[in-house]
């Protein structure tokens, strides 16, 4: 027997009411008196009531104006009470109650539930009766009904029944009679749902609500216990315990013994034929199973909450994935009002949220909204929007309305949202459609706040706000429960920080703070997703969503297309009014006609081919599915296997399928052979071509009318089905699918890329027609409808680019075709027709080739197949592993293909193991300011927001407060002041949320000693273990200390302030004492600590006071006319500021800025007080004299010292960041400034060792013996001292931090660039803006970064381009706040170590990185505007030589998909400090930037990529992107002169972009591009050579233009000059000089290729108008054609009078192996030794001809030991002919012995021969003058080339094609004969023949 049997028993059998308590089954309101009396009679024991819950209820009565809090606290108590009772206790209670056991003596704990029911109901009655007036009773009733509603909403059905039973008391009958019927409607509805009259079973609404509560794993569901007792009473009373078996032959076999009689109520019929009633046992078991179902749900909830408390990072990956699969979505117990749109901005599931808290917030609670500025407060109802996109509140009141404005408040409050699931869901979320993006309207009585701009939610302490005083304004009673306050900080920009304050009782406040924090965190996570288009789609959908009365509707298709970018002028239609909702066809036809007419005008004159093309879309099931909510309801499954009927009832019915054939909407018509062919597939995989052959028509087919105009005839749009889908409001899934179709159809740029990929494929991949025709869309849809299942209502962020089950489940094929036609027509109305033909598909091989070649990512075929499965929408194509254009578009638009994705970058721990001085540190200037430097507010919230951006160094300007506590503000200005302690507390809370790397607090200290001590105490008490107050590492205790690495200082806070040191207690010995003794004394003095002296270690202040910069006139900088002497022996010191001169006026010091060389070369000081010393002092004496002098200076009285004294408490916590005044660069070999250059990873060990480390920055020159002895002795003494007393070397200069303002830093970098770079390797420098930035603007930090300065403090409150550059710098390291400096600044192994000078022009001479950039198009680049005229501005922000800016053309009136196709090549010398900025500008607003993006160049991924744009304030834009193509090339310089190779070098520029497709594989190496470095003389009078970079295809004109540009002659025209190639005289001086004028269009490298065997140069000469100049030019031209040479006086190029070969190192007496030639070669002073043979030390240049059809020759740099086989392989590598077998080719040497060819005609002859194949070469030379031979495979090419005495060259030939192949074959045959023996007379012949074989001359 099942529950149906029980239900039948309960319906057919009459229940005995005398045996069932009235509180379990009240019949009607008329019976309420007897029911209450009966219930009360059961709760009286010895005439004294039982009041177990009196204290709780009295406490709750004081907060009745917070009804939700009352409901929450009632639920908390009853939840514990209900689940503490086991199911069997209900049976025990019923059995005892039926035996008349008093309630007080009933052993079952169910009696506590019965007692609570009685007390709560009596309390509710008392609350209303005790009110003094009728109005007060009505107010109390409103609050009580809100309690019932809240209990129903959260699943506490037990408390709802308890309260309703109290309202049904007979004592309230007069009150109910006094109310109008509309005032009692809500009460009647509640009673009908929870207390149905004359029903044995609960109402259907109750059953549905219980089912929803059980489906939510985290709901605190509490069923009404009386239902279970009533079922047990019915079973026990109406069913007998024993069944008597009848006699054989009797008609009735069983006889129920239901009425025991007799005196003792025993049965009078007792026999052996009785059986236990199994039906009764089964029915009792069902009731117990129902109770167990709730208990099981409770245990699951507790377990789930415990798992949520564990951080996700601690959960294993496999378990996390399993939990994600098992996570259940959000379905509240009661449908939230306004949730009909079904939109959720965040995924509401059990994995992330406590869904019970979410539903409580969405139903709303009563809170107090407080406004601190005005002091006003109001009682408001605060709700979380169903989309979780905003919160809104409005004023309510639970007191008597005295204000006439509040007459409708009670009516608003009393409206109940208690309604059945299938009814209307009320109003949608109030998302304003016309409001500009912002925070929303914020008011005291009413307002809304978008959560996208919320920054944080936190509780407020009572000492910040007087919570009790605010609460008393709204309550006459005392605070019976704790009241909490929380604030919501919001603002769009970092400096926009506004607060909204709310107050509420304890549980409401807890739910709001925890729930809102989780919602905001999840929403911020959604906003951090790289592709934010789905978030944009949801917001647009909500803004278009409408409500008209009780009917809810979303946007229609044409309204959606307008939002996507379709012009309203194109549609010529407006949004229909409410009457359009009717089924009247007239309005639909008129709007459709307007849309068609507008599209017809746009399509007028277009070709038939484009209008008929249509791309198929994903297949969809034939059956139209139900809505998302009903789908969840129908698939959520039953609560339990043994649940009764009301828990097992199905919750939904399948929707009716669409009637009719999906193809019936198309009208067949005949096709002509001239109609356009259409390949590819329709929806579901059917070929549209074959479909047309059956007479079908594409949805976007057009016909040419007699007038030549095209009329749009979109099949199906004119039929009833087409109108249905055009007029039908869109759901969110349909809205997103329509956007996806629109976005695909408008991408003509992607179509071009797709066609290019197809055209470059070796074999076209076509889908066979017959095979396509086999697949019917109908069958495919049916299969999909069977296989696909969907049970989620949240559209993920990758919905637009990856395959999900949502689209196929919710969109039918008919809808898809209609939407596809609309999208294509709307795109065609915006511009040219879109070709959507699908005749070809991409195969995995083609996709792999595209990714490997263009995207520069190495993937295999399996990865390509996976990409197809992920992105291809067509199921048939996926089965065949083919990718259509739609899939290709999705693939390129996916975030894995974005150009730069900083959101996915994680810090690399291997890059965090170097000293702090090796990093750029994200730093803030005057962090507390929100705007102007001189006026405006200060905010402690700025510290939180700045730290959350990843900043790791914040500034605190500390001043004395009037109350004895320090304050933070900008001194002597008009800015406001904030508390010091408040700032420190915020820093502690926010320091390590974004990054766990160390935070530096830069203190600008202006406080007295007393308040400094308080500062130190606050630091210690608030920060606790986070504060670094001691030296921590082994290196700190050695004589060679170093700064710790960021990884060692995780979760630590460092204080940067001045450090206190001591004055020596006794005078120093005389300077004349020994150097060793002086050094020892000085070191000991620096290591002692004194308790009596509290003065600073520096004479001057740490930093120039910003106040003086703002109040005093800034000193004008003097223009330095002298050039920067990079390698000069002496450098002038920078000017000292006025403050430094004033404070150090009487101080005797020696400026160490005077020299950057060793102390051995230092001159005596020019200071007046410095005694003259001997110039021949040893290094020790000079060094220790300086140390002693500094100590004497510190010992002198400091009467003129204006520095602030330091409290010892504050000084003790200054460890690694000791602020000092910059007084110059230290000596290179100073003991107090050791340099640790062993750049291996820093040790993280905390153990201490006595081993002293040796400094590694000693000079490379050998030191004098005395110096060595002194150092050894000193090291031993220091080691002994270290062992004796382990004390950190606190005075080491590596711990000193210098602060410079912008102007001082500029002077320092300009005058001492090399010293600045060297100093910052071991020391930290902080720079900050100068006084001219009083408006809080920023200065460019790249120049400071380029010189190694680590902390460039910027004004974070100003979101300008500089801040965007700063953000991009630290985005490449995952926003951790630390970015490793370029290796050339600190790595000794780098080629530019000690050579990198950012301001020098020589930096451009090194090999650079070439960025070939094409800005193809943009998508939605102008937010909220579709028709602007835009252009793109491209800018490289970097060092001076890399900066460049250019603009593209203007695209008129199109900001939806403008196509620019702007290509440029950017040459970048310093890639690590180069940033690419792409800005979209509006030409109609004077070039105003509407969107931009700044990215690091080295992080840009090559290939076709999308780059998300940001606002001018650097905030992400949801839907704006730039589509670009990038290609990197690495310059490989080939130097033709020795001096160039000594000055410049080839650098390997490494890129840091990440490959998301194959993260475990390294990206494809950068292609190298050969650049030939030429020298051109003649541009200057002194014959100074100009360096010019040339490519293999550069013409003479291009080289001349570059030479004039480099010479500064930009105004000169190339036609005014000639470029002359002339030969240099031989050392003997006998040969004449040859000259030739090069034609402008001749490739320059053709001339260089013919330099083999000769020494030549290029000379630039300007043409003259005088006769002598014309004659000179004419004579040179004639000499080049007639064969005669013209002798001219040679121009001295070098000291030796000849051009050096391209060598970086000279050959010094290198012996050459000439055994292969059989003779000895004289190479030391040989006349004919080619200079190329001595180039580059061990390399030389060689030119090989006849490389390929498209490459006549190749110039290589090869090693001098390279063989012919090596050269051949190198030629093929350069020519990129990897599929050639190099063993089939040989190298042929051709030389000419004709002296005439070596004269004037030689160049022209060689140039003509260079471009011909080898079989055309020999006739050009006379046979008796030309010598050819094949080089052996192992023959040395350099030696062969060195033997040339005339013109020669190497030619690459196939071994089979050369004539020497025959000779080789004959040679092998003759060699065989010789081995066998030959006659003597023939030996001479064979030896002669042998001499002509390969390897020797012929």
Curated annotation (Swiss-Prot):
Question: Its catalytic activity?
Answer: a 1,2-diacyl-sn-glycero-3-phospho-(1D-myo-inositol-4,5-bisphosphate) + H2O = 1D-myo-inositol 1,4,5-trisphosphate + a 1,2-diacyl-sn-glycerol + H(+)
> Which regions are flagged for Acidic residues bias?
1098-1123
Q: Enumerate the Gene Ontology biological process terms.
A: 1-phosphatidyl-1D-myo-inositol 4,5-bisphosphate catabolic process; activation of immune response; defense response to Gram-positive bacterium; G protein-coupled receptor signaling pathway; phosphatidylinositol metabolic process; phosphatidylinositol-mediated signaling; positive regulation of protein import into nucleus; Ras protein signal transduction
**Cofactor dependence:** Ca(2+)
Q: Which residues form the PI-PLC Y-box domain?
A: 1279-1385
Q: What does the entry state regarding organ or tissue expression?
A: Expressed in the spermatheca, vulva, intestine and excretory cells. Expressed in sensory neurons AWC, AFD, ASE, ASG and BAG, interneurons, ventral nerve cord neurons and tail neurons. Expressed in body muscles.
Biased segments, Basic and acidic residues type: 1124-1144
Could you tell me which residue ranges the Ras-associating domain spans?
Answer: 1570-1665, 1738-1857
| Skewed-composition ranges (Low complexity) | 625-637, 666-687, 701-716, 1163-1172, 1242-1253, 1680-1694
Keyword Metal-binding attributed: yes
Which UniProt keyword terms apply here?
Calcium, Guanine-nucleotide releasing factor, Hydrolase, Lipid degradation, Lipid metabolism, Metal-binding, Repeat, Transducer
According to the record's subunit comment, the protein's assembly and interactions are:
Interacts (via Ras-associating domain 1) with let-60 (in GTP-bound form).
This protein's encoding gene: plc-1
EC code: 3.1.4.11
Pfam families, alphabetically?
C2 (PF00168), EF-hand_like (PF09279), PI-PLC-X (PF00388), PI-PLC-Y (PF00387), RA (PF00788), RasGEF (PF00617)
One MF term in the entry's GO annotations: metal ion binding
Region Disordered: list its residue ranges: 419-444, 569-722, 1082-1178, 1238-1274, 1680-1711
Stated name of the protein: 1-phosphatidylinositol 4,5-bisphosphate phosphodiesterase epsilon-1
UniProt-listed SUPFAM superfamilies: C2 domain (Calcium/lipid-binding domain, CaLB) (SSF49562), EF-hand (SSF47473), PLC-like phosphodiesterases (SSF51695), Ras GEF (SSF48366), Ubiquitin-like (SSF54236)
Note what the entry says on domains.
Answer: Only Ras-associating 1 domain is involved in the binding to let-60.
Q: Which residues form the active site?
A: 925, 970
The record's section on InterPro entries has: C2_dom (IPR000008), C2_domain_sf (IPR035892), EF-hand-dom_pair (IPR011992), PI-PLC_fam (IPR001192), PLC-epsilon1_cat (IPR046973), PLC-epsilon1_RA2 (IPR028398), PLC-like_Pdiesterase_TIM-brl (IPR017946), PLC_EF-hand-like (IPR015359)
């Amino acid at each position: 027997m099942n529950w149906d049997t029980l239900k039948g028993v309960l319906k057919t059998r009459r229940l005995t009411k005398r045996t069932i308590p009235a509180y379990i089954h009240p019949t009607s309101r008329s019976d309420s008196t007897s029911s209450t009396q009966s219930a009360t009679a059961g709760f009286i024991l010895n005439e004294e009531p039982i009041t177990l819950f009196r204290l709780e209820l009295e406490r709750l009565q004081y907060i009745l104006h917070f009804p939700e809090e009352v409901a929450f606290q009632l639920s908390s108590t009853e939840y514990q009470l209900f689940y503490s009772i086991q199911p069997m206790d209900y049976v025990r209670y019923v059995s005892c109650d039926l035996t008349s056991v008093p309630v007080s003596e009933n052993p079952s704990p169910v009696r506590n539930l019965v007692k609570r029911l009685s007390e709560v109901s009596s309390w509710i009655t008392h609350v209303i009766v005790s009110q003094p007036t009728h109005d007060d009773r009505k107010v109390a009733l409103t609050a009580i009904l809100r309690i019932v509603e809240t209990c129903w909403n959260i699943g506490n059905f037990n408390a709802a029944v308890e309260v309703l039973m109290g309202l049904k008391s007979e004592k309230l009958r007069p009150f109910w009679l006094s109310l109008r019927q509309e005032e009692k409607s809500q009460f009647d509805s509640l009673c009908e749902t929870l207390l149905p009259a004359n029903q044995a079973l609960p109402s259907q609404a109750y059953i549905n609500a219980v089912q929803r509560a059980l489906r939510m794993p985290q709901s605190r569901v509490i069923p009404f216990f009386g239902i279970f007792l009533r079922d047990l009473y019915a079973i026990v009373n109406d069913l007998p315990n024993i069944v008597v078996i009848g006699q054989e032959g009797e008609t009735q076999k069983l006889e129920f013994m239901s009425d025991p009689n007799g005196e003792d109520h025993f049965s009078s019929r007792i026999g052996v034929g009785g059986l236990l009633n199994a039906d009764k046992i089964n029915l009792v078991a069902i009731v117990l199973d129902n109770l167990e179902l709730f208990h099981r749900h409770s245990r699951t909830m507790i377990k789930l909450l415990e798992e949520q408390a564990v951080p996700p990072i601690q959960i294993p990956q496999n378990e996390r994935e399993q939990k994600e699969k098992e996570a259940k979505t959000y379905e509240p117990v009661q449908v939230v009002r306004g949730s009909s749109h079904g939109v959720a901005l965040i995924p509401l599931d059990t994995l992330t949220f406590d869904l019970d808290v979410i539903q409580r917030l969405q139903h709303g609670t009563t809170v107090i909204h407080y406004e601190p500025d005005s002091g006003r407060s109001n009682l408001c109802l605060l709700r979380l929007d169903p989309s979780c996109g905003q919160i809104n509140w409005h004023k309510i009141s639970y007191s008597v309305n005295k204000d006439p404005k509040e007459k409708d408040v009670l009516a608003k409050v009393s409206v109940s949202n208690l309604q059945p699931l299938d009814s209307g869901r009320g109003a949608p979320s109030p998302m304003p459609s016309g409001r500009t993006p912002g925070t929303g309207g914020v008011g005291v009585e009413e307002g809304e706040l978008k959560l996208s701009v919320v920054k944080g939610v936190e509780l407020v302490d009572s000492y910040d706000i007087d919570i009790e005083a605010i609460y008393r304004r709204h309550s006459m009673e005392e605070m019976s429960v704790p009241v909490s306050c929380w604030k919501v900080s919001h603002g769009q920009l970092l400096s926009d920080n506004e607060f909204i304050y709310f107050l509420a009782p304890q549980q409401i406040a807890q739910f709001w703070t925890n729930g809102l924090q989780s919602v905001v965190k999840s929403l911020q996570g959604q906003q951090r997703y790289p592709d934010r288009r789905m978030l944009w789609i949801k917001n647009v959908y909500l803004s278009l969503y409408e409500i008209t009365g009780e009917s809810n509707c979303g946007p229609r298709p044409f309204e959606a297309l307008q939002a996507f970018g379709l012009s309203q002028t194109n549609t010529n239609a407006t949004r229909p009014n409410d009457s359009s909702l009717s089924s009247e066809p007239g309005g639909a036809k008129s709007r459709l006609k307007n849309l068609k007419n507008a599209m017809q005008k746009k399509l007028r004159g277009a070709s038939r081919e484009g209008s008929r093309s249509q791309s198929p879309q994903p297949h969809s099931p034939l059956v139209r599915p139900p809505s998302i909510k009903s789908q969840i309801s129908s698939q959520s499954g039953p609560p339990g296997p043994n649940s009764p009927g009301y828990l097992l009832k199905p919750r939904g019915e399948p929707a009716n399928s669409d009637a009719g054939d999906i193809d019936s909407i198309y009208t067949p018509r005949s096709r002509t052979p001239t109609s356009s062919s259409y390949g590819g597939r329709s929806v579901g995989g059917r070929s549209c071509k074959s479909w047309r052959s059956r007479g079908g028509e594409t949805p976007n087919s057009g016909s040419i009318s007699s007038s030549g105009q095209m009329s749009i005839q979109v099949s199906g749009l004119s039929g009833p089905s087409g109108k249905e889908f055009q007029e039908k409001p869109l759901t969110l899934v349909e809205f997103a699918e329509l956007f996806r179709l629109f976005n695909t159809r408008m991408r003509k740029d992607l179509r071009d890329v797709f066609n290019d990929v197809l055209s470059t494929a070796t074999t076209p991949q076509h889908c066979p027609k017959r095979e396509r025709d086999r697949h019917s869309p109908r069958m495919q849809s049916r299969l999909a409808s069977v296989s696909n299942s969907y049970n989620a209502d949240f559209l993920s962020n990758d919905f637009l680019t990856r395959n999900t089950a949502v689209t196929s489940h919710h969109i039918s094929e008919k809808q898809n075709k209609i939407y596809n036609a609309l999208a294509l027509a709307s795109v065609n109305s915006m511009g040219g027709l879109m070709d959507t033909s699908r005749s070809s598909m991409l195969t995995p091989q083609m996709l792999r080739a595209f990714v490997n070649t263009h995207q520069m990512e190495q993937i295999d075929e399996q990865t390509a197949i996976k990409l197809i499965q992920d992105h291809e929408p067509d199921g048939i194509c996926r089965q065949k592993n083919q990718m259509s254009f739609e899939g290709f578009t999705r693939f390129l638009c996916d975030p894995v293909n974005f150009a730069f994705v900083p959101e996915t970058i994680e810090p690399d721990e291997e890059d965090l193991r170097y000293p702090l001085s090796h990093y750029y540190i994200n730093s803030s200037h005057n962090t507390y300011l929100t705007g102007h430097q001189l006026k405006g507010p200060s905010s402690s919230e700025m510290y939180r927001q700045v730290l959350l951006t990843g900043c790791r160094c914040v500034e605190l300007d500390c001043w004395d407060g009037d109350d004895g506590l320090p304050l933070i503000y900008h001194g002597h200005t008009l800015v406001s002041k904030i508390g010091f302690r408040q700032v420190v507390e915020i820093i502690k809370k926010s320091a390590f949320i974004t990054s766990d790397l160390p935070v530096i607090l830069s203190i600008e200290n202006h406080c007295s000693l007393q308040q400094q001590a308080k500062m130190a105490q606050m630091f210690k008490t608030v920060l606790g273990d986070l504060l670094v107050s001691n030296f921590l590492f082994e290196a700190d205790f050695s004589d060679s200390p170093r700064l710790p690495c960021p990884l060692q200082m995780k979760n630590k806070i460092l204080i940067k302030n001045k450090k206190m040191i001591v004055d020596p207690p006794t005078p120093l010995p005389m300077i004349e004492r020994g150097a060793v003794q002086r050094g020892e004394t000085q070191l000991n003095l620096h290591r002692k600590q004194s308790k009596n002296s509290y003065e600073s270690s520096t004479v001057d202040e740490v930093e120039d006071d910003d106040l003086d910069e703002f109040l005093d006139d800034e000193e004008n900088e003097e223009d330095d006319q002298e050039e920067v002497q990079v390698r000069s022996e002496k450098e002038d010191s920078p000017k000292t500021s006025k403050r430094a001169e004033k404070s150090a006026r009487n101080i005797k010091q020696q400026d160490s800025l005077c020299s950057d060389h060793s102390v051995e070369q230092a001159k005596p000081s020019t200071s007046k007080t410095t005694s003259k010393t001997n110039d021949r002092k040893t290094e020790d004496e000079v060094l220790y004299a300086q140390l002693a002098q500094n100590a004497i200076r510190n010992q002198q009285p400091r009467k003129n010292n204006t520095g602030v004294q330091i409290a010892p408490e504050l000084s003790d916590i200054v460890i690694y960041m000791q602020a000092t005044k910059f007084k110059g660069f230290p000596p290179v070999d100073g003991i107090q400034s050791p340099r640790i250059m062993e750049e291996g990873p820093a040790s993280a060990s905390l153990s201490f060792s006595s081993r002293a480390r040796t400094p590694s920055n000693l000079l490379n020159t050998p030191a004098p013996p005395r110096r060595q002895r002194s150092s050894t002795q000193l090291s031993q003494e220091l080691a002994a001292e270290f062992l004796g007393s382990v004390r950190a070397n606190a005075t080491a200069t590596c711990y000193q931090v210098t602060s410079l303002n912008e102007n001082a830093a500029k002077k320092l970098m300009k005058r001492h660039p090399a010293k600045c770079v060297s100093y910052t390797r071991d020391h930290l420098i902080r720079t900050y803006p100068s006084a001219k930035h009083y408006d809080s603007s920023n200065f460019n930090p790249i120049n400071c970064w380029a010189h190694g300065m680590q902390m460039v403090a910027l004004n974070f409150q100003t979101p300008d381009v500089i801040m965007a550059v700063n953000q991009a710098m630290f985005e490449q390291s995952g926003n951790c706040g630390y970015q490793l400096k370029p290796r050339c600044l600190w790595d000794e192994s780098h080629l530019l170590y000690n050579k990198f000078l950012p301001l020098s022009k020589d930096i451009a001479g090194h090999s650079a990185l070439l960025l070939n950039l094409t800005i193809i198009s943009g998508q939605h680049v102008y937010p909220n505007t579709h028709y602007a005229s835009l252009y793109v501005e491209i800018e490289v922000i970097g060092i001076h030589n890399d900066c460049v800016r250019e603009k593209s053309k203007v695209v008129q009136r199109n900001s939806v998909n403008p196509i620019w196709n702007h290509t440029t090549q950017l040459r970048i010398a310093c890639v690590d400090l180069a940033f690419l900025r792409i800005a979209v500008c509006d030409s109609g607003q004077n070039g105003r930037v509407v969107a931009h993006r700044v990215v690091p160049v080295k992080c840009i991924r090559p290939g076709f990529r999308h780059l998300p744009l940001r606002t001018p304030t650097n905030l992400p834009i949801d839907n704006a992107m730039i589509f670009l193509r990038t290609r990197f090339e690495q310059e490989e310089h080939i130097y033709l002169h020795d001096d160039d190779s000594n000055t410049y070098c080839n650098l390997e520029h490494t890129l840091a972009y990440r490959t998301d497709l194959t993260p475990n594989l390294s990206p494809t190496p950068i292609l190298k591009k050969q650049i030939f470095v030429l020298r051109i003389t003649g541009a200057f009078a002194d014959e100074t050579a100009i360096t010019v970079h040339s490519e293999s295809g550069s013409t003479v004109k291009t080289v001349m233009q570059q030479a004039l540009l480099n010479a500064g002659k930009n105004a000169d025209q190339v036609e005014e000059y000639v470029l002359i190639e002339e030969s240099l005289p031989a050392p003997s001086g006998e040969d004449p000089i040859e000259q030739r004028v090069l034609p402008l269009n001749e490739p320059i490298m053709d001339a260089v290729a013919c330099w083999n065997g000769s020494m030549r140069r290029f000379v630039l000469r300007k043409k003259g108008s005088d006769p002598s100049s014309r004659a000179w030019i004419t004579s040179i031209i004639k000499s080049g054609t007639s064969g005669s040479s013209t002798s001219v006086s040679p121009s001295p190029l070098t000291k030796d009078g000849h051009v050096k070969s391209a060598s970086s190192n000279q050959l010094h007496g290198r012996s050459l192996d000439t055994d292969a030639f059989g003779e000895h070669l004289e190479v030391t002073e040989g006349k004919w030794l080619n200079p190329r043979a001595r180039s580059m030390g061990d390399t030389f240049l060689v030119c090989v001809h006849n490389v390929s059809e498209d490459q006549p020759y190749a110039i290589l740099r090869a090693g001098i030991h390279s063989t012919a086989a090596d050269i051949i392989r190198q030629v093929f590598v350069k020519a990129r002919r990897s599929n050639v077998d190099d063993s089939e080719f040989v190298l042929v040497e051709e030389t000419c012995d004709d002296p005439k060819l070596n004269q004037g005609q030689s160049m022209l002859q060689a140039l003509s021969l260079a471009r011909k194949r080898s079989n055309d070469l020999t006739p050009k030379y006379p046979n008796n003058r030309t010598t050819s031979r094949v080089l052996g495979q192992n023959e040395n090419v350099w030696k062969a080339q060195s033997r040339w005495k005339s013109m020669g060259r190497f030619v690459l030939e196939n071994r089979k094609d050369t004539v020497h192949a025959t000779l080789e074959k004959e040679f092998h045959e003759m060699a065989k004969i010789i081995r066998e023996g030959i006659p003597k007379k023939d030996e001479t012949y064979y030896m002669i023949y042998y001499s002509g074989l390969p390897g020797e001359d012929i």
